[in-house]
């Protein structure tokens, strides 16, 4: 986020979407950081939601213990439970951020020098979020972002993350192997979107495209 804030004033047209590791950060702090970036970039900020399953990363923060699991073994009940917990926490994280961005009404700032009033307190609202991982009362300490709701994105490689994309994101990045799998992934994400009551919301799903430059690795490297 700090790098994006530094880059923002020297750019004009690109969106700035830093990654936030939600497993080891707090949604209140992240929400105001992204809101500030939206001001610095005049409405071009977004956030990419990322979870961490690394015991090494967890040790650096010291907030929680992360089990050592083979996350590629998706049939392992322990892996499924752990992954679902991370993604569930991420969904709550996004919900808190969105509520905090909406906790200031658009005209909450008065900036009346004569009376010394900067805000109309009646236009700031508690969010009163209580979940399994967070309890956040609000409101935010940063005014409503220029966009209102900065763009939320997420990368998904499997069914559980697809649920996060469908239920919480504005943009989803996926990695299909072929066109048939791409259709299956989009169907799964749209189903999750509908189940979350977001069927009318705009959700863009973008797939990675692998480009082969040449049949030979050496020739491809040369190109």
Residue ranges and their predicted role:
Residues 1-223:
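N-terminal glycine-rich cofactor-binding segment that shapes the pocket for flavin-like pterin cofactors
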């Amino acid at each position: 986020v700090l790098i994006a804030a530094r880059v923002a004033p020297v750019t004009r047209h690109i969106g700035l979407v830093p990654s936030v590791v939600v497993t080891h950060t707090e949604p209140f702090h992240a929400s105001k950081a992204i809101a500030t970036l939206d001001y610095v970039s005049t409405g071009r900020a977004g956030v990419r939601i990322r979870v961490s399953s690394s015991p090494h990363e967890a040790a650096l923060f010291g907030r929680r213990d992360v089990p050592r699991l083979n996350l590629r073994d998706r049939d392992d009940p322990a892996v499924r439970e752990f992954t679902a917990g991370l993604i569930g926490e991420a969904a709550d994280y996004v919900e808190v951020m969105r509520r905090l961005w909406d906790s200031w009404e658009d005209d909450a700032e008065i900036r009346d020098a004569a009376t010394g009033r900067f805000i109309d307190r009646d236009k700031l609202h508690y969010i009163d979020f209580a979940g399994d991982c967070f309890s956040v009362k609000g409101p935010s300490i940063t005014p409503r972002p220029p966009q209102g709701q900065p763009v939320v994105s997420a990368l998904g490689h499997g069914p559980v993350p697809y649920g996060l994309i469908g239920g919480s994101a504005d943009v989803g990045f996926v990695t299909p192997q072929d066109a048939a799998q791409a259709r299956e992934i989009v169907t799964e994400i749209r189903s999750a979107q509908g189940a979350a009551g977001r069927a009318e919301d705009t959700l863009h799903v973008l797939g990675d495209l692998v480009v082969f430059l040449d049949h030979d690795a050496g020739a491809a490297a040369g190109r």
